[in-house]
Amino acid sequence: MDLLGDQHFAAQQPPLFDATPSSLKEDAEELIAETIAAWDSIVSQIQTENATFQNTISPIIQDENVKSQKQRVLTFYSSTSPSKDLRDASTAVGRLFNDAEIELYSRQDMFERVDQVLQQQDKQVVASLDEESLYYIQKLHRRFHQNGCGIAEEGQRVTFKTKMKRLGHLVQQCNKNLNEDKSGVWLGLDELDGIPQSLISRLKQGDGENSDHLWLPTKVPFSSPAITNAKSEATRKRIYCAIQNRMEMNVPLFREIVLLRDETARLLGYADHATLKTADKMMQTPQAVEALLSEIRTAVAPLAAQDVEELLEIKRNEAESRGTTADELYFWDLAYYSARRGEAEKKISSSISEYFELNTTLAKLLSIIEHLFGTRFRRVNAAGRDEAAGSLIWHKDVQMYSVWNVDGPKEFLGLFLASSALVMNYVRPTDTRPTLLSLDEVRKLFHEIGHLLHSQWTQTKYAALHHVDRDFVEAPSMMLEQFFWVEQHIKDVSFHYSHIDSKMKDMWKATLVDQDDTNPPEKPAQLSDDVVFNLARANQSKAIQGQLKEVFFATYDMLVHKPASRAALEALNLTELFNKTRSDVYKVRGGEALGGGWEWGHGQTVFRNILNRYDAGYYSYLLGRVFAMDIFDTGFKEKTPSREAGRRYRDMVYRVGGRQAEMKTMTDYLGHEPSTHPYLAWLQVFACVVPRDMVPNTAQIGSITTETIVGLLSPVRMAVWGLLPIKWRMTRELSACKQRCLQEDGHLVALEVRLVHSRHTLAAAVGEQRVAAPGSTAYDAALRSYFSVQQAAMQPACVVLPQSDEDVSAAVRCLAQLHQGGGESCRFAVRSGGHTSWAGASNIQHGAVIDLGRSAPSSSRRTSRRSRSGWGPRGAMWVGGLTLGGGLSYTSPRYGWTCDAVSQFQIVLADGSVVAADSKERPSLFRALKGGSNNFGIVTRITFETFRQGPVWSGTVYSLSSTAEAAIDNFVAFNSATSYDEYASVMTSFVYNQARGLPVVANLLQYTKEVTGTPAAFEGFMAVPNIYSSTSVASTLATTQATAALNSGGVRSLTYAVTLVSTKEVIQAAYEKWSTSYPAIKDVRNIIFSLVLEPLPPAIYQRHATTNTLGLADRAGALVVAELSVSWADAGDDALVSSTARALVDDIVAAAKSLGGFDPYIFANYANKDQAQDVIRSYGAESVSFLMQVRHEVDPKGIFTHLVPGGYKIPEH
């Protein structure tokens, strides 16, 4: 029978799982006896002085190689077998092996021979061994030493051995208690509100006095979704306290374990257990571990505190909606309010797991492994599994795979779930519900697969070197886990279970609320781009909280294993320490806040890792993450990593195993010393890359020296391995600041130092190539491309050139974090096309500019009747400011404002999340963006409804100023609300151009319907004598380009906007004010002084008045947008031009009001940043109130109100 379902066969048979309780004991005793016999043979035949690698070490290795796999199988039953008898027998076998190893590795006679072989190598009296063999002997020697062979006095060695056996038995008993744990809590039906029905349906119904209750086990698959979703705080507290009070019998056992570890370490001559355990690991000393923990805790703490405050605010709001109050966040609240955070998470949290059915997800994960690492997984065929169920697998639910090499020879790599076993804790599928995973569980699954891969692919000479040091073991798996912080990989693996087969589809339909709907709309097969982006980004708080958890556990681990003294440890209350440390790290309280005291729970009793091989080593999870991020950043950051990258990683990391020092493995693969930079960037703790308290204030600048600067940027503050390249660049720039300080008497140099700090922090967030510094080609090009000289003259600290939504998100998060420390350097501008003229509209002095218009090749595309405007070159695609301000075009009479044609916005919010807003998803934000300027975030993509447009009749007709009255008559008649031709568009301008020395009338005419000859709507305009006409029929593109040519940039310019009622008297008055105004500035060099009239009939403003925020729904009749547009050459004329323009606007407003022809609405696209041009308030009280409400929802801290001075701001009150 071909159990492997493949034409290739393994060189040896896989292990069998056919043991009985008695056979386990017999096999274990036989293995132990064989080892003792082998060692006795060595000692009896080889004198100490004659010991060599060949006659002493090789026999030990041969015995280990044979015994290692058999021993693992015999002890495997203790945690996996469905039979309690087998579990108990396997636990007893574990005690036998533990005691036997203590006896073996405390044998002084064998230690003397091993020591002799090592000394021969050290003294080079024999031929040198290869590096792997020498490394093996060194580890073997340390193992003997740590098992008491370094203790000189025989009586102490016996004491040590006895205590080590007792220690092993205690650990096994604690584990047995944990494995047999059946704890839980009874929940009444009134306590289940919010808990998913899919979970409730799996809970056991009580009987007797609990007949109306359900039993919720404290095991993670049950308790985690319950505490995350239960609406009642009392319910959440009951569940959490039940979890924290499991295994009371382990409290004294754990205390004895800690005391014995300390005592045995001191017997070996170590200061404490932590010093013993770190001595042969990568970190080498407890002090190095403490420095790592302190560094990470310091980096994460500010954002963690912010996170807690945000969750507390959600809790307060929820309490207020229920008519109660809430003043504090507790541990049992963290998961629940984290899940309630943010619109994106709220919408997807309940259904995201539907895209990750266990078996389908596993298959997709394995396919990623196959692609990356050149392997093939073959599921053992069903017939083979059934026949082998009693021997090849230990439970009928086990899935078995064979693993083969693809690149090169068809090399067999072992049986995936026999030689290596993946044991996960999932709720079993039922006939009505499959096993569905959360995204965190998908990450965890890929993480654990990583451990299997390490086991499968490691190739060493000796079984003992197959495993790496405990503080490196997590890094390779955490690297794989990181794939699912990248949106493309999340999307690739996602697959809604209703698409798997018809049975699964029926299961899904049965979960729908509307059971009467026989044909509900199908779920998309994969998660959308927007959702996966936000899944990746919205998990920052989870990442922060996750790292806090690791800091807490690692800190507690070091506190109990590195006491100040033996007496201090004996006096230590381990339960109180556990709860106090957790509260101190999280800045959140638990039962102690409600009168329970510091012993309200004993969570240390279920701290499996500290019991099992992670004692004084839990920091490995943090160190592993640091390493993992550096590995991922080095080799797998591309969206589609190549097989070459995967094979390189497999060969240089996985294959090496523990045959050399793990730090060498890391540096060989990375090509550099490990860095915390990718880790901090992953957490988005950008402000902590260069802490703000390093930056000197003005008072410090006077005496600053280069040495002082270097001290401010010390490697200790720059993280464990430092960000030295950034440090060096900052040092050079700050040294230059110091030179300017000496030359300029210190003026503004403190500010300049802050700017350097901010720029490099941004570079750490989005990448150095995407942050242009002053003096660079990219920086200069960005400034030159502004439409107005006033904008171009501003000098930002840097220009961010994002290449993706992810870059924009990172930049926003970074700037928001910098803001926590205050300072002008944290303010920023957002630029789309850069056409607004007033200084600061989309540029900023001493801040950062996020420039969307000079970023990446255009991604505009048309699908069906929609067109997307996204990443693209300025002028070609970027219409962000135009659209957010309302926008008018020559098709507006048919379709409304430009913003009315939008079907969806994609926007980066203040918290960095990227969300879509349309009529169904976030409809309030969707409406607010239609006129609400840049108060809510950075719009990175706009999807427009499109229509087919043929050739356009268009052109400009110029006439002398003597025809002004006729022009006004024609304009008013054209703009009549009762006879407006929606295919016609007119802009009438009264223009003084110094180059021509006289005023003229210009009518820009456009007609968007195919006509023969002059359109009837324009007959009046064309009947007026003209001095030049450019009318013709041309394509839409040609017409647009011709219009753009009339508005070239590179000049000083300003605009004002006023809205008038469309009557001859009002417009005539405006014209007369203009005609008496321009003479005051007619001698200004290159002045162009224009009053532009643009029709605003009900056909435009009423068409979608209730779905935008422009506030014109209550208007009736034709209006006019009057724009004062001025350009000139010299800065020396700024004051004269500005005062003349402002006076003219005031005169026009006063005249219109006197005639009853003034409308308060101000068109944002033509407005000025002037106290009299309060654009948002001009929309009216109802719109202002609505915009304030939406701002509070999406930007409660006012990031885009306070940090972005450009645009038109929503009032504070």
Swiss-Prot record:
Coiled coil: none annotated. SUPFAM superfamilies: FAD-binding/transporter-associated domain-like (SSF56176), Metalloproteases ('zincins'), catalytic domain (SSF55486). Keywords: Hydrolase, Metal-binding, Metalloprotease, Protease, Virulence, Zinc. The active site is at E448. Zn(2+) binds at H447, H451, H454. Oligopeptidase; part of the gene cluster that mediates the biosynthesis of the phomopsins, a group of hexapeptide mycotoxins which infects lupins and causes lupinosis disease in livestock. Within the pathway, phomG and phomG' are probably involved in the processing of the phomA and phomA' precursors. The pathway starts with the processing of the precursor phomA by several endopeptidases including kexin proteases as well as the cluster-specific S41 family peptidase phomP1 and the oligopeptidase phomG to produce 10 identical copies of the hexapeptide Tyr-Val-Ile-Pro-Ile-Asp. Belongs to the peptidase M3 family. This is Oligopeptidase PhomG'. It comes from Diaporthe leptostromiformis. The gene is PhomG'.
